UniProtKB/Swiss-Prot annotation:
GO terms for cellular component: cytoplasm. It holds the Pfam family GHMP_kinases_C. It comes from Natranaerobius thermophilus (strain ATCC BAA-1301 / DSM 18059 / JW/NM-WN-LF). It is an enzyme of class 2 (transferase). One of its GO terms (biological process) is threonine biosynthetic process. This is Homoserine kinase. It is found in: Cytoplasm. The gene is thrB. GO terms for molecular function: ATP binding; homoserine kinase activity. Gene3D superfamilies: 3.30.230.10, GHMP kinase, C-terminal domain. The keyword Repeat does not apply. Pathway: Amino-acid biosynthesis; L-threonine biosynthesis; L-threonine from L-aspartate: step 4/5. The keyword Membrane does not apply. ATP binds at residues 96-106.
Amino acid sequence: MEEKNLVKVQVPGTSANLGAGFDSMGIALNIYNYVSLRQLEPGSGVIIEVKGEGADFISRDKDNLVYQAIAGVYREIYGSDVLIPDLEITLENNIPLARGLGSSAAAIVGGAVAANEMFNGELTRDELLKHVLELEGHLDNIAPAMYGGLTCSLITRENELMFRTVDVVEDWNFIIIVPGQELSTQKAREALPERIAFQDGLFNLSRANMLILAFQQRDYELLWHSMDDELHEPYRAKLIPGLDRLLQEVRGAGIPAAISGAGPSIACVLSEIEEEKIVRELGKEKFSAHGIESNFFKLKPDNSGAKSILH
């Protein structure tokens, strides 16, 4: 395979945890970031252009996450002592940052897949996955961004990665309620307790089993019961005003809902058109009561994952 002068990769956003699948499940959704690479003449340097989300503050130097992923894959292909060529990197971002929709995972996966595509790379997706985990340690976002669908993952006792992917039917719509207030992953992590009660662990374990079956069997009632949590949501929901009450009322309306990733967004799964109005009204009401604006994304599952779209 020869090197290419120009590549463009599409990578989906993700919603991790889905309630009971804390740190082990995630789903890819059809909101996309795009990474374009173009090789430049030697001496041109690295040029990074950012469009869309984060354009005002995303790093445009070698600290950029996409560049770090590109550099890592290049060294994996050619060796650690080889100089990385000069590049023009264009990022078109649609995934909101710091909202629990996998923006960091999308950046790293996009950079890695684009580099493998450009630089004569024959690394498998599994090999790329291991590489990107060194930059982004959350497999629950990385795996669905790379492969698409619903992914379930674990780390074996021998410290090996293991995961499986389930294609998700596209009948169900996801409404993502995105409050206009950031929540860093670090702050969301710090809110978690050091120990959990045995009953809370059992609560999640029983629902995580059913959560996978609910998606496989298109069982909406089962999804409502299983998309629930006692390990992280009770603590994180208190970090954003109105979030706790909103989650309770959406679920109380019979709609499966969970904090997306570390938050602060909420992922709701709809089976009927009428439910969309309920979710939007509740989202506006609960956040506006605290002076927080909210945005809504109507999405569907993405079963393809990251892929080249320039041939």
